[in-house]
């Protein structure tokens, strides 16, 4: 995520983060779809060999990534100061809890689900990929419109809470109808739809909410939360599997999702700000110039990098009026296209 932030323009970063989120979600589902089939062909040792080869391919693909020619460094704050700033922001913490809970539930489910498909749906392990793949396609069919609505019509908070509710609904179906093959598949389908929506929304929301100067720090905390969630999800899934009580297992996961929903109600609607990078004009008093810039209607955040001669600005385009544009032109010494 940090590398992606380095090689994308500030104004394109939200789109890039949403695309990365969907890629992560797809990778999980495709892996779980192909895993049983590959294991039946090459065994566990062969599966690890395939994983190693794919890791090497991923390293080779990094050669195609554009070289970073401009490094964004913040000399005004140390790393610990940035970390302190990030962990004190309530909405960012709720997003960290969200990615933790999402990946905990996903990992726990995919330790728990195979035994359910074998016992109640009577689907052999080698055929589980044929279950997951259609569910993936169906979930994407519903997930893409939800993401478009969230971004285009500024309904992110509503779609976000609806997706968590969808996860809960899928788990409730599994609690009360896991013995039915069709209810089991329906519950998994609803979970997949909600999961893919959440996986795309979380990085996008994080990019919107994190301060410019601490964005990489926020991404690091979020990524750590994600993998911690996967770790605890694997541990929890194994414990639930040993209970040999399906209803209790699904109930525990549903309880976690309900707690997550209650925490997420505290999220405020993200501000839909545009991030732009502008060349820094020749000014003697940078602090005074920054203060004047922040006083302009529609300018919400400014980070100046004197060594790079650029200014990173978050702008509320809907609040900009003709007077604001004239003030921007005066401060930058030329017309600013926003």
What are these regions (language model features)?
Residues 1-24:
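Cytoplasmic helix-loop-helix junction between adjacent transmembrane helices
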Residues 111-127:
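Short amphipathic helix-loop junctions that connect adjacent transmembrane helices
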Residues 158-172:
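Structural signature of the two symmetry-related core transmembrane helices
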Residues 142-155:
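Helix-to-loop junctions at the C-terminal end of transmembrane segments
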Residues 1-8, 197-210:
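Intracellular juxtamembrane helix-capping segments at the cytosolic ends
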Residues 53-71, 260-268:
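C-terminal membrane-cytosol helix-exit motif in multi-pass small-molecule transporters
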């Amino acid at each position: 995520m940090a590398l992606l932030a380095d090689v994308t323009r500030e104004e394109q970063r939200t789109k890039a983060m949403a695309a990365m989120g969907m890629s992560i979600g797809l990778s999980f589902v495709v892996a779980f779809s192909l895993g049983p089939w590959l294991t039946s062909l090459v065994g566990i040792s062969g599966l690890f060999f395939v994983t190693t080869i794919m890791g090497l391919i991923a390293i080779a693909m990094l050669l195609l990534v554009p070289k970073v020619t401009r490094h964004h460094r913040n000399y005004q704050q140390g790393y610990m100061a940035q970390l302190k700033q990030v962990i004190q922001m309530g909405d960012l913490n709720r997003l960290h809890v969200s990615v933790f809970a999402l990946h905990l539930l996903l990992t726990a489910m995919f330790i728990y689900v195979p035994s359910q498909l074998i016992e109640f749906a009577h689907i052999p392990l080698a055929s589980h990929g044929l279950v997951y793949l259609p569910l993936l396609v169906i979930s994407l069919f519903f997930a893409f419109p939800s993401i478009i609505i969230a971004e285009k019509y500024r309904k992110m908070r509503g779609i976000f809470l609806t997706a968590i509710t969808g996860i809960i609904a899928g788990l409730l179906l599994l609690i009360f109808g896991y013995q039915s093959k069709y209810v089991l598949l329906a519950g998994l389908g609803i979970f997949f739809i909600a999961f893919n929506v959440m996986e795309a929304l979380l990085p996008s929301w994080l990019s919107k909410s994190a301060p410019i100067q601490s964005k990489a720090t926020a991404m690091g905390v979020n990524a750590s939360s994600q993998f911690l969630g996967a770790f605890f999800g694997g541990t929890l899934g194994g414990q639930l599997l040993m209970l040999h009580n399906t209803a209790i297992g699904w109930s525990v996961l549903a309880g976690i999702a309900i707690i997550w929903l209650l925490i997420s109600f505290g999220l405020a609607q993200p501000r839909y700000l545009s991030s732009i990078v502008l060349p820094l004009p020749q000014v003697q008093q940078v602090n005074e110039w920054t203060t004047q810039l922040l006083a302009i209607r529609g300018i919400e955040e400014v980070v100046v990098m004197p060594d790079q001669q650029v200014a990173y600005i978050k702008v509320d385009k809907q609040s900009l009026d003709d007077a604001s544009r004239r003030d921007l032109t005066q401060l930058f010494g030329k017309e600013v296209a926003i």
